[in-house]
Amino acid sequence: MPSMIVVGGQWGDEGKGSIIAYLALHDEPEIIARGGVGTNAGHSVFINGKKYAVRQLPTGFMQRKARLLVGAGVLVDPEVFFHELEHLKDFNVKERVGIDYRCAIIEPKHKELDRSNGYLHGKIGTTGSGCGPANADRVMRKAKQAKDIKELEPYLTDVAAEVNDALDEGALVLVEGTQGFGLSLYYGTYPYVTSKDVTASSVAADVGIGPTRVDEVIVVFKSFPTRVGAGPFPTEMPMEEADRLGLVEYGTVTGRRRRVGWFDFEMARYSARVNGATMLAVTMLDKYDKEAFGVTDYDKLPRKAKEFIEEIEEKVGVPVGLIKTGPELEHIIDRRDTI
């Protein structure tokens, strides 16, 4: 069985959480591991009409048979971690989660610096979660590690060893990235970016998967890309236009209103290339064409929606295998057997 990595192709908030949740339940991976930056990115998923938002734990938590892991490359905020254990207690998360003992720790001083620094919080528009300052301490070899926090001891593990052991045994491993290509420290709209690279290569390294062991890379795009905070947004539409189209969204972590734009095919193609996409996922197709809401059969999509998907495939050069047509888990078209 393969390893599968899911990353964002735009500026985050693409709907990765809903794609990951579907894959977790449908494909039944034995391990779901989180890579990415840390608690500055929130993933949301609707289960039976209830919204669950996580910032630290893997979004595939609802797959009760899976081991849930947080890779060594991820920053851990103990306060957020324990809050989510309680928040998700109905899913038996506490007994299934493991944190790599090498994860760097976000301390209160990091959050305070993130929120009080005029450049980071004012100009760049960071979330104030402390990730940038914590990663800076990590680079300077000053950050604490998970193994230094007594309260985390029951959850410590070697994530890289667990993941590679699972792959050796033929198990399916699902790896979650955070944020999106446009926020990558290396490839994004610098300096309006996050504090590390968030492409598929880095996300694989975060959990200890070498490049030869990556089988599938799914890059997620939203039909109308959004961005929270400052920075270039070439296809941004006026807020009045977003209101008219019913495209009003707020960030999971910050609560700030998201800027909205038109689909950027040029960016999508570049993002897919650098991420090494084997497949694309498109979310919120129902926002592009309201008649697509709830459709689960590709052949039954209205013409406008289907032409949009075909245009993405043609211009990006990668097949679209998963299409979200609404907020609930079952609002999805799975074309993976036909592409």
Curated annotation (Swiss-Prot):
Which residues bind GTP per the record? 12-18, 42-44, 258, 284-286, 324-326
A single Gene Ontology MF term assigned here is: adenylosuccinate synthase activity
| Transmembrane spans | none
What Gene3D superfamilies does the annotation carry?
Answer: Adenylosuccinate Synthetase, subunit A, domain 1, Adenylosuccinate Synthetase, subunit A, domain 2, Adenylosuccinate Synthetase, subunit A, domain 3
| Gene Ontology terms: cellular component | cytoplasm
- E.C. number(s) listed in UniProt: 6.3.4.4
Task: List positions binding IMP.
Answer: 13-16, 40-43, 127, 141, 179, 194, 256
**Which reaction is the catalytic activity of this chain?**
IMP + L-aspartate + GTP = N(6)-(1,2-dicarboxyethyl)-AMP + GDP + phosphate + 2 H(+)
| Annotated residues for binding of Mg(2+) | 13, 42
UniProt keyword terms in alphabetical order: Cytoplasm, GTP-binding, Ligase, Magnesium, Metal-binding, Nucleotide-binding, Purine biosynthesis
Active site, UniProt feature: 13, 43
Tell me which cofactor or cofactors this protein depends on. Mg(2+)
**Which CDD domains is this protein grouped with?**
AdSS (cd03108)
Q: Pfam families per the record?
A: Adenylsucc_synt (PF00709)
Residues annotated to bind substrate: 252-258
The Gene Ontology biological process annotation of the record reads: 'de novo' AMP biosynthetic process; IMP metabolic process
Q: List the disulfide bonds.
A: none
Q: In which pathway does it act?
A: Purine metabolism; AMP biosynthesis via de novo pathway; AMP from IMP: step 1/2
Where, per UniProt, does this protein localize? Cytoplasm
What is the main EC category here?
ligase
Q: What does this protein's record comment on cofactor binding?
A: Binds 1 Mg(2+) ion per subunit.
Family indicated by similarity: Belongs to the adenylosuccinate synthetase family.
Q: What role does this protein play?
A: Plays an important role in the de novo pathway of purine nucleotide biosynthesis. Catalyzes the first committed step in the biosynthesis of AMP from IMP.
Subunit description: Homodimer.
Return the protein name. Adenylosuccinate synthetase
Which species does the entry assign this protein to?
A: Pyrococcus sp. (strain ST700)
- Identify the taxonomic lineage of the organism of origin: Archaea, Methanobacteriati, Methanobacteriota, Thermococci, Thermococcales
